[in-house]
Structure formats: structure tokens, C-alpha cells
């Protein structure tokens, strides 16, 4: 049962999708410090399928995260066995810096627990993360603005480079892969290019992509209260 809240916390969200027109919703519950502690998912055929729960330490750092979801590659909507504990994460800190995440859920879904050491995350003196064992990131380099300029991976098969202007705005990203051509992404304001070809540009209501007839397809986005995209749509080309 949903309980109304009068302190600004959202107690429930409701939505439908065009594919089945089924009403789905989350009920949200908070602790005494207004931190979310539980999110219960409901629909007429999928009760509890995507539930989540959270706990924190005294500094507000996340200690445990439990999340249900799909635990097979191609889940069937009406097969409850295809859904279960996707993430059951325990977090370890040194002060307020995360040092280790242990997953007791399905390791190939949700968070990928790629390491099992005492120090899975390392930081520099400015607090920037310099390595991430779970993502096989061996070294991250930063500039004087504390922005990443180079990311090296343990496999040594790829390196990512970033270029910025003097204000810290990102200008270019290069993914250099061993034995393969590099992939360049360039950022010119709202215009995004890949390997010198325009991919899209942003506008106030979404973005536009070039089509094969020398024009642009405009995609419009409906966002929630946090700015997350909940719906993308474009005009019907036949109308």
C-alpha cells in the first residue's frame, strides 16, 4: 500500500509501456535521514520482480545493495524462474573511499564482480580513482583539473585518451585498440562526431541524427523529475 509523503520524497511512480499497456509502479520507502531504503515493484503479473533494498553506514556511504532482476540472457516475461537476485552487493571503505565490492548475487548480471582482493579501488592524493580491478582498469591518468586523460586496461589491448580545452570541456575521445583502427569521438558543442562523421546533435527537446537522404531525423525525449529519459519518440514518416 502506498503512503503519501509530505516532505518532498517521492513515494510512488507509475508508468505504462506501449507494448503491453500494463500498469507498473514502484513504491519507495525511506529511513529517518530521508535515504531510500527500499523500492518495491508491482504489476499484475510481475510482483516483486524488480525489488531493491539499500543500507548505509553512519557517514551515509552505501553498505549493502540488494536488487532483483533478470538472471538469464533472454528472460521470458511470464517465466518467474528467469528473474531472481541480480545483485547482492557488500561495500567496504577506507574512510569514505570505496575499496572493495563483493557480489553474492548472479555475478554475470548487474554489477560485474571481476575481482576479489582487499584493495579493488585505488586513489591518488586528490581522491581521484586511479585503478578499478572490477573493470580491469590498471591505471587512470589525470590532468591539473582532475579530469581523466588516459585509461589503461590490464589486458593491454585497448587504451582510452581524452582531450579537453582550457576550461575542462571535453573535445575528443580516442579508443585505441590493439590490431584494430582507433575510434575517435569529437565533441563540438552540441555536435557529436565519430571518425569525422556527424552522429547527432542535441536540441532543447532531444536530439537529431542525419538520415540517408541528406536531412535529419528529430528524436524527442520525455524526461522524469531527475532528467532521466523515460520515452523517446519521432514523427510517423507516413503521416
Segments and roles (model prediction):
Residues 230-238:
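Short, low-complexity export/processing leader segments characterized by acidic and small residues
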Residues 1-166, 171-219, 238-239:
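Acidic/glycine-rich beta-solenoid
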Amino acid at each position: 500500500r502506498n503512503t503519501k509523503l509530505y516532505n518532498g520524497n517521492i513515494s510512488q511512480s507509475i508508468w505504462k509501456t506501449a507494448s503491453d499497456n500494463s500498469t507498473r509502479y514502484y513504491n519507495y520507502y525511506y529511513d529517518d535521514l530521508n535515504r531510500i531504503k527500499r523500492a518495491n515493484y508491482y504489476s499484475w503479473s510481475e510482483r516483486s520482480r524488480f525489488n531493491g533494498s539499500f543500507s548505509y553506514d553512519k557517514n551515509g556511504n552505501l553498505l549493502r545493495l540488494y536488487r532483483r532482476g533478470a538472471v538469464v540472457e533472454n528472460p521470458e516475461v511470464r517465466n518467474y524462474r528467469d528473474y531472481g537476485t541480480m545483485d547482492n552487493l557488500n561495500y567496504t571503505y577506507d574512510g569514505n573511499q570505496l575499496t572493495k565490492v563483493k557480489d553474492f548475487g548472479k555475478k554475470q548480471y548487474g554489477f560485474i564482480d571481476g575481482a576479489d582482493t582487499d584493495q579493488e579501488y585505488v586513489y591518488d592524493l586528490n581522491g581521484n580513482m586511479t585503478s578499478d580491478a572490477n573493470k580491469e582498469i590498471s591505471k587512470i591518468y589525470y590532468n591539473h583539473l582532475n579530469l581523466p586523460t588516459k585509461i589503461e586496461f590490464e589486458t593491454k589491448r585497448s587504451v582510452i585518451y581524452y582531450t579537453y580545452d582550457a576550461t575542462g570541456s571535453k573535445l575528443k575521445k580516442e579508443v585505441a585498440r590493439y590490431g584494430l583502427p582507433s575510434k575517435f569521438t569529437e565533441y563540438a558543442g552540441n555536435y557529436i562526431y565519430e571518425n569525422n562523421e556527424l552522429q547527432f546533435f542535441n536540441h532543447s527537446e532531444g536530439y537529431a541524427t542525419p538520415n540517408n537522404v541528406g536531412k535529419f531525423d528529430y528524436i524527442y525525449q520525455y524526461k522524469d523529475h531527475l532528467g532521466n529519459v523515460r520515452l523517446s519518440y519521432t514523427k510517423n514518416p507516413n503521416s
